[in-house]
């Protein structure tokens, strides 16, 4: 039993005793002053008891309200924990990293803010969906580069995408021109090999021909000869070389660089052209487009 309850019981017992004494005085002749004193004492005791009971009730109400507030604060803390679980660490490679430092996750994002974070070396960037106003997509994300690993980004997603516009990474096609030796035709020919690989998106496909130290290697092509009738309807016919080489022309091993070298060759044939005319003819062939094939 609590101390407050014991005090209330004692007050009520004392009031009961005073009421009994007042009753006895009324049965017997007694002075009016003594009766008034007993009545005032009884009223005082009951007032004290009522005050104690009301105080305990207010105290219990206050205690319950504090318990409810504590539960609410715990629930808020749990909600924060749940929201923080929607976090993922994404490893970003150079090939997929965008110029603005964000990552390509298949959605269209627009950066709307950046903030310095206390205790962190890198700022935190804030992005919203590009279709926020056109399609009412409320998805947002926060991107921050890791302090320990520059290629690691911590991304926090808030909300889900409701838009229907999802981007997909584009691929570019590289064309490498190299000199190869083949036994199918009479001479050596230039083959174009196509390689597709995931790279940073570009607007158009490129034909890349890397020529290193061209001025120092003009002697490589001193026996090349061409005539106008050999190029017809976008087809490069087989006679690319006239005469036989002592050593075969080895193919280029690097992706798009021409590094082959001829060790020895016979005397130049009639109407042979220099390396400059060879490359001008090669440019004309490349201008035909990507659909030219060997006949």
UniProtKB/Swiss-Prot annotation:
Keywords: Brassinosteroid signaling pathway, DNA-binding, Jasmonic acid signaling pathway, Nucleus, Plant defense, Transcription, Transcription regulation. It comes from the Eukaryota. The lineage of its organism: Eukaryota, Viridiplantae, Streptophyta, Embryophyta, Tracheophyta. Its main location: nucleus. This is Probable WRKY transcription factor 46. One of its GO terms (cellular component) is nucleolus. Induction: Up-regulated by drought, salt and hydrogen peroxide treatments. Induced by salicylic acid (SA). Up-regulated by E.amylovora. Triggered by P.syringae. InterPro entries: WRKY_dom, WRKY_dom_sf, WRKY_plant.
